[in-house]
Amino acid sequence: MQGAVDLLVDGTDRRVGAIRVEGPPAPDHPSKAAPIPRSCNGEPETEGNLVRWSFLECDGGVTSVVNRMKDEGQFKRIRGQAKYTFLAIKAILKWEKQSGTIKIDLGDRTPVDLSGLFCMSMCQTFGGGYRVAPGARPTQGYSSLVMAWGLSKPQMLGLMGPLEKGKHIGRWGVTMQDAMRFEFGDVTGPPMFLNVDGEAVITTPATMQYHDDQLTVRGADSIPNEVSGADGEI
C-alpha cells in the first residue's frame, strides 16, 4: 500500500495515446443493457453511431464473441481465467464462417475470411494475461495491429496456447504491424461485436483511429517496456 501511495505522490508522468472507436451500438439484452452515448466521447461522424475511446485495446472476432457470451451470463458460475477458456472453446466450436472487409491506414479495402480475430492494441496483454501484441507499449506513439484471419476451427483452438505466451505471430499467417487507423465492415452475416477495453459495446461497421498524447499516466521512474519493449502491460 505504501508503495502505491509513493507512486501517486512522486511517480513519473507519461503521456499515452488512445483509440477513438465508432460504430453502431451493441443491441440491448436482458443481461446487458445497450450502451448509452456520452457527450464526453464527442459526436459520431455517422448519425446513430456510438463513440468510445480505448486506452488499452479494441478487438473483434472470436474474442468479442467470448465477451458478449460473458455479458449474456454464460458460464457465470465459473470464475477466473477458466471462464474465458470455456467461453473461447464454445465460441470456436459454434463459429459460423463469414466474410468482411478491412482497411489499414491509407491502404486499399481488402476482403477477408473473418474466422479468427484482430486486436488493435497499445499494450502487450489482455484477457487475463494473454500476450496478444508482444512488445507493444503504451508510450510507443502508435497502435499495434494483430490479425489472424482465415483460420479453421482446429487452428483457432490450437492458437489459444501460443496466444497466451505471445508465440503466435507468424503462425498460420498471424501478423502484427504498426497502424494508426483500422476500418472493419461489410460483414456478410450478422453484425460482429467489437470489444473496447474489454466491453462488447460496438458492432460493425466500425472505424478505429489512434490519437497520440491523450492521457497522463503516473508510474515508476523506470518501466521495463520503455527499456526493452518486452513488457507492454499497463
Language-model region placement:
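Catalytic core of DAGKc-family lipid kinases
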Residues: M1-L117
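Residue-level signal for well-ordered alpha-helical segments
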Residues: E43, E47, R79-Q81, W95, ...
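Short N-terminal binding/cap micro-motifs at the start of the first secondary-structure element
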Residues: D28, G127-G128, V217
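ATP/nucleoside-binding phosphotransfer catalytic cores, i.e., glycine-rich phosphate-binding loops
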Residues: L106-D113, R131-I234
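Short loop segments at secondary-structure junctions
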Residues: P24, C123, G150-L151
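Short, flexible coil/turn micro-motifs enriched in small/turn-prone residues
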Residues: D6, T12, L56, M122-Q124, ...
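Hydrophobic alpha-helical context, especially transmembrane and signal-peptide helices
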Residues: R52, F118-M120, T188-G189, T204
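Glycine-rich phosphate/pyrophosphate-binding beta-alpha loops
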Residues: D59, T63, C119-A133, E199-A200
